[in-house]
């Protein structure tokens, strides 16, 4: 948001954004947030515990502290702020810092305007999903990051008029965390998670009411009453996203519902974080964020008709002629 700010400040914030992201990711990967979990420590102690150079670490933490991430309580002694506590672990924010400051950061640095393959593929020689399959430790980090905010996403699902006894198919549901949260709130529901075999999941957390089905959403989707796509379609270009929707449409009955948990990008110059996420999708996956008009067009191509647009939730039903 630039209204009321000096033009130079607007440009400067954009210029320094890349290095801020990299520094945050580096500090998280060093384990600094966890090292400070028990209380403030001198930077010399942190350097010994994490294998970093003390002077370099001091400069990195000082820069982050100026943005409210960590605080320098006295010269050379750092502690947590509410913002840095999010990075200790277990919430997904540490994983996002690792991704944004690492492999996604390198992909963003390779963005070109030629409309060809994503920068990630140009750099690594393979697509992101194949790369994750070959790097299981990164796949696990990615899945934990995607689980961040599951309570918020589940809150959005409450806008749907649940009957209470539906079978819910979470298409591309990763480790199943979204369905776990939903079924805890609605004990009458039954869940099915569809995702690739290499997806890391917690069988104990899934429980008896959730079945994990291995497979590709480009090929086959289990039958259900409600299909959920939680931040899946933005990973794909229009043609691929329409293929996913058509696969679901083949399994859906006439009274099934589709719930899409994805951003509805604001048009024009309105400030909207999803516009920057859209550029990240371009760099890493050749995916995209979409406006309401673009969502309507995509749903129609996939055999669905939108019923209503909630905040970050699109409700649709099979089109009569789908």
Regions found by a protein language model. Give the residues of each.
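Conserved Class I S-adenosyl-L-methionine-dependent methyltransferase catalytic core
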Residues: 2, 7-42, 48-49, 54-166
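Residue-level recognition of alpha-helix initiation/capping sites
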Residues: 27, 55-56, 173, 239, ...
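Conserved adenosyl
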Residues: 91-270, 306, 311-313
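C-terminal alpha-helical "lid/dimerization" subdomain adjacent to the S-adenosyl-L-methionine
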Residues: 261-302, 307
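C-terminal lobe and adjacent flexible extensions of AdoMet/dcAdoMet transferase-like proteins
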Residues: 314-322
């Amino acid at each position: 948001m630039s209204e009321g700010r000096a033009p130079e400040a607007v440009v400067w914030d954009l210029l320094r954004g890349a290095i801020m992201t990299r520094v945050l990711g580096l500090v998280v990967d060093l384990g600094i947030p966890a090292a400070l979990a028990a209380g403030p420590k001198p930077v010399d102690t942190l350097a010994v515990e994490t294998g970093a150079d003390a002077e370099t670490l001091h400069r990195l933490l000082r820069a982050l502290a100026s943005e409210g991430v960590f605080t320098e309580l006295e010269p050379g002694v750092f502690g947590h702020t509410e913002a840095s506590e999010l990075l200790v672990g277990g919430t997904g924010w540490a994983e996002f810092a690792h991704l944004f400051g690492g492999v996604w950061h390198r992909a963003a640095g390779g963005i070109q305007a030629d409309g060809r393959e994503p920068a990630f593929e140009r750099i690594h020689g393979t697509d992101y999903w194949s790369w994750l399959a070959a790097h299981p430790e990164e796949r696990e980090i990615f899945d934990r990051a995607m689980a961040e905010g599951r309570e918020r996403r589940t809150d959005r699902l409450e806008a749907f008029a649940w009957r209470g006894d539906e079978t819910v198919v979470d298409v591309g549901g990763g480790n199943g965390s979204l369905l776990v949260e939903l079924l805890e709130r609605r004990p009458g529901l039954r869940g099915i998670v569809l995702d690739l075999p290499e997806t890391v999941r917690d069988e104990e957390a899934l429980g008896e009411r959730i079945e994990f089905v291995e497979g590709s959403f480009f090929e086959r989707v289990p039958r259900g009453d409600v299909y959920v796509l939680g931040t899946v379609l933005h990973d794909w270009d229009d043609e691929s996203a329409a293929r996913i929707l058509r696969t679901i449409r083949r399994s859906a009955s006439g009274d099934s519902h589709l719930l899409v948990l994805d951003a509805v990008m604001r048009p024009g110059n309105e400030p909207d974080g999803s516009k920057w996420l859209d550029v990240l999708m371009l760099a890493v996956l050749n995916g995209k964020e979409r406006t309401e008009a673009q969502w309507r067009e995509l749903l129609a191509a996939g055999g669905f008709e939108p019923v209503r647009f909630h905040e970050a939730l699109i409700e649709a039903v099979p089109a009569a002629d789908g």
